[in-house]
């Protein structure tokens, strides 16, 4: 009698386990699909806050985006202040902002209103744009971000508008252009033109401002550095 009961239990588990595994697999697929849709939504929102800066009057990103003399910038508040790198705007005789709005490119003159050479950051404002631009927030925990955290970079490398690259935080204790300014190392692809663009967490919050790459060929080699978000936030307040 006992053997019959044991046999029945074994048959029951054999029949149930595949069903449970299948249910778990289906749940995992649904979670992945939901996360992917959420990530896509975050990117679409973030795109509206990332601008192109042209430092070369002979370069028009609308018609010839592959040329040099381009940087990225990110809108950081309701007023429309834009954060970028110091090395993008310093000592430039020409500086113009390109912004994609309502399915068309618009370009504006800008004023440099703050410089922080030590942190390689600069603050600019747009001249003549009346409607506010969407902005991104700094992550509250930007100073506590850990190695291994998923991040993505958004910018205009080589004029390729709104290029998104995904990676992880490789280290939080690097130093960019100054031994006292901490930077984030990431393997998110960063190239020329990404400078000044945001490095973001999966919620679309700024955790860093992309600043430079370490490479022997001046192209992405999996070692990119971004000024840490908490440092950038303090820099903005001081400017």
Residue ranges of predicted features:
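Bacterial N-terminal signal peptides that target proteins for export
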Residues: 1-8
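Bacterial N-terminal signal peptides
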Residues: 8-18
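Conserved active-site neighborhood of the chymotrypsin/trypsin-like protease fold
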Residues: 27-31, 58-59, 77-155, 159-162, ...
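Extracytoplasmic/periplasmic, Sec-exported soluble proteins
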Residues: 31-38, 42-45, 65-75, 89, ...
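Sec/Tat-exported extracytoplasmic proteins
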Residues: 43-50, 54-57, 79, 84-87, ...
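Active-site loop architecture of trypsin-fold serine endopeptidases
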Residues: 59-68, 92-95, 133, 154-166, ...
């Amino acid at each position: 009698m006992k053997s019959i009961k044991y046999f029945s239990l074994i048959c029951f588990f054999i029949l149930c386990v595949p069903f449970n595994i299948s249910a778990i697999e289906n749940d995992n697929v649904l979670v992945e699909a939901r996360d992917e849709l959420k990530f896509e939504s975050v990117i679409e929102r973030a795109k509206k806050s990332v601008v192109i800066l042209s430092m070369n009057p002979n370069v028009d990103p609308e018609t010839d985006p592959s040329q040099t003399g381009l940087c990225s910038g990110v809108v950081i508040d309701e007023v429309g202040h834009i954060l970028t790198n110091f090395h993008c705007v310093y000592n430039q005789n020409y500086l113009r902002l390109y912004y994609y709005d309502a399915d068309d490119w618009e370009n504006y003159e800008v004023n440099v209103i703050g410089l922080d050479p030590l942190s390689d950051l600069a603050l600019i404002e747009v001249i003549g744009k009346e409607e506010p631009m969407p902005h991104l927030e700094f992550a509250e925990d930007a100073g506590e971000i850990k190695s291994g955290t998923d991040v993505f970079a958004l910018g205009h490398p080589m004029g390729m508008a709104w290029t998104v690259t995904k990676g992880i935080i490789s280290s939080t204790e690097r130093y960019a252009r100054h031994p006292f300014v901490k930077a984030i190392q990431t393997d998110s692809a960063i190239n020329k033109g990404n400078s000044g663009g945001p490095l973001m967490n999966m919620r679309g919050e700024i955790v860093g401002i992309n600043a430079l790459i370490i490479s022997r060929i001046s192209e992405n080699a999996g070692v990119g550095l971004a000024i840490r978000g908490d440092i950038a936030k303090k820099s903005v307040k001081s400017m």
